[in-house]
């Protein structure tokens, strides 16, 4: 078995913590980093620190942004009366790639999962209810992963928001447990077009 020096092993270990990165890819990334000139490594380190320090959450929808409100919420050409609810920013990005949705978003930060000790209180659901109750919203579209956790979260949010506005859920042409970020743009566009009433 190949053993690496302690600094290299530590670097590989950090890369292995990244989502979707296995031991081999972590090794390739670490070896690639070591081949780069010191100036590139300094620029990379600076970019990491700047992103970590300056990127936060939009005060309105909780998308990632370096401003008080994200670009989507500030865009006056977007339909402010339709909100698409997603679990994570990566899901928002997937839906934006479909070019089908012209409204705004609300990123709740995960899914309800008692097994993982994630309760509704730990998600941005209360802020969503406040946002809807204080605004003239025509429709809430739930675009959550087709899974037990996604279904649980959709039903929970649906019960809270139905008294205020119409609540729909995107249609799915994908198997249970699929992640939205890996679904192609055409399937996502059709899912948005074929959305159905939740309750």
Curated annotation (Swiss-Prot):
What UniProt keywords apply to this chain's record, in alphabetical order? DNA damage, DNA recombination, DNA repair, Metal-binding, Zinc, Zinc-finger
What would you give as a GO molecular function for this chain, any one?
A: DNA binding
Output the superkingdom of the source species: Bacteria
Q: Which Gene3D superfamilies match?
A: 3.30.60.80, 3.40.1360.10, 6.10.250.240, RecR Domain 1
Supply the PROSITE patterns for this chain.
RECR, TOPRIM
* Transmembrane residue ranges: none
| SMART domains (UniProt xref) | TOPRIM (SM00493)
For biological process, the GO terms are:
DNA recombination; DNA repair
Query: Which InterPro entries does the record associate with it?
Result: DNA_Rcmb_RecR (IPR000093), Rcmb_RecR (IPR023627), Rcmb_RecR_Znf (IPR015967), TOPRIM_dom (IPR006171), TOPRIM_RecR (IPR034137)
Where are the C4-type-classified zinc fingers?
Answer: 58-73
Q: Identify the SUPFAM superfamilies for this entry.
A: Recombination protein RecR
Pfam families tied to this protein: RecR_C (PF21175), RecR_HhH (PF21176), RecR_ZnF (PF02132), Toprim_4 (PF13662)
Residue ranges of every copy of the Toprim domain listed in the record: 81-175
* Record family assignment: Belongs to the RecR family.
Q: What does this protein do?
A: May play a role in DNA repair. It seems to be involved in an RecBC-independent recombinational process of DNA repair. It may act with RecF and RecO.
Entry-linked NCBIfam families: recR
| Protein name (database record) | Recombination protein RecR
Lineage, please? Bacteria, Bacillati, Cyanobacteriota, Cyanophyceae, Synechococcales
